[in-house]
Amino acid sequence: MQIGLDFNLVEDLVAGVDEVGRGPLCGAVVTAAVILDPARPILGLNDSKKLTEAKREALFDEICAKALSFCIARAEVEEIDRLNILQATMLAMQRAVEGLSVTPKLALIDGNRCPKLSVPAAPVIKGDSQVPAIAAASILAKVTRDREMSAFELIYPGYGMGGHKGYPTPVHLEALARLGPTPIHRRSFAPVRAAWEAREGITDSLI
């Protein structure tokens, strides 16, 4: 049985912000900002990692239907490689908050640091398992990114992206070594860089 967070904790015009995708070797980092409506309860909100895929999908639709405002944003692979993953994540969070159709009086950010925002903000460590709005944001971000990685499975077969979602599992690392990086792999990440350099070495030896 999955028990959700207490919806009575929801405050007026407080945005919850979270990210998914800092650790994977490929794909964008996806963020979401959500302002919940205290008058429209959503049961079962929790850290997206603690929910089944089916529950996340159901909550995704309910959050989109009932939230006062939400925005899903991202930083692309090129931005991650240019800025580094931390700065790209901060940029994506900034985009999510700025994309809200309603201006929050406060943004609560999952983690231990905040992006530069035009509204007051505070970090909340493990916020996705404490603050309903952050939990909602974690669900929107994870479902969005998981759907993208499942789509990439069809575009780049052989890597198992629909299963590991880009994380550095043994299956992914083996495929990376065997097939080489794709255009959506983050070349600033060490395993990808090593695979790229190995491929370059093979190419050079064949010339």
UniProtKB/Swiss-Prot annotation:
EC number, UniProt record: 3.1.26.4
Main location as per UniProt: cytoplasm
GO molecular function term, any single one: manganese ion binding
Subcellular location: Cytoplasm
Binding site for a divalent metal cation: D18, E19, D110
SUPFAM superfamilies xref list: Ribonuclease H-like (SSF53098)
Enzyme class: hydrolase
Reaction(s) catalysed (UniProt annotation): Endonucleolytic cleavage to 5'-phosphomonoester
Alphabetical keyword list: Cytoplasm, Endonuclease, Hydrolase, Manganese, Metal-binding, Nuclease
PANTHER family per UniProt: RIBONUCLEASE H2 SUBUNIT A (PTHR10954), RIBONUCLEASE HII (PTHR10954:SF18)
Family the UniProt entry places it in: Belongs to the RNase HII family.
Protein name: Ribonuclease HII
Gene responsible for this protein: rnhB
